[in-house]
């Protein structure tokens, strides 16, 4: 069972984000909130049942705390001296009539996707050369326990400098957090999100 967040609290947070967008401090923000989930599964059970492309289960032995995460998005891939990112932005239920045409024709979804692709391209430029958008706004089909959804993705790549292997931590630090889960511009939007949450 998922317990709904307090609507009044969420409305205040939304108003903080919205007023910053109206003032031009951000033009895309992902506002989230904590919710309580009552479940008879352990974190390990959830991890093993998750259908995400990427799943992680972290256990802190000192505090006995656990964290589980699953995501369909490939944030960063490094292969043969190249770095790739595959931002996802734009989703629709695949069972809806003409779902593909609706999603690909949606101006709001297209604008959000363009914003995040530009942000990730910019982030990759901090750590790589010859950054390019290799594939723009293609469809992925994601299979969930409630049915398929369509998601738009892009592929962005760049060439890492010689010796990058010694600096993987710095590369990830320059890229994190992923713009597709924060918003744009990233630093200011993160300040706004922190203020609202």
Protein language model features and the residues they cover:
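Extended alpha-helical targeting/anchoring segments
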Residues: 1-197
């Amino acid at each position: 069972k998922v317990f709904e967040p307090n609507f009044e609290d969420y409305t205040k947070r939304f108003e903080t984000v919205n007023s910053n967008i109206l003032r031009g401090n951000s033009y895309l923000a992902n506002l989230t909130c904590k919710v309580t989930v009552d479940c008879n599964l352990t974190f390990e059970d959830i991890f093993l049942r998750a259908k995400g492309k990427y799943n992680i289960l972290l256990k802190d032995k000192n505090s006995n705390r656990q964290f589980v995460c699953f995501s369909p998005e490939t944030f960063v891939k490094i292969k043969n001296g190249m770095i790739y990112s595959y931002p996802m932005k734009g989703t629709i239920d695949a069972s809806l009539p003409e779902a593909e045409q609706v999603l690909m024709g949606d101006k709001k979804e297209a604008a959000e996707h363009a914003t995040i692709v530009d942000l990730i391209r910019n982030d990759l430029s901090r750590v790589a050369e010859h950054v390019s958008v290799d594939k723009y706004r293609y469809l992925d089909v994601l299979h969930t326990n409630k049915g398929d959804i369509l998601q738009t993705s892009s592929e962005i790549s760049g060439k890492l400098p010689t010796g990058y292997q010694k600096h993987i931590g710095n590369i990830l630090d320059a890229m994190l957090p992923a713009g597709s889960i924060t918003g744009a511009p990233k630093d200011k939007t993160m300040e706004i999100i922190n203020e609202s949450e």
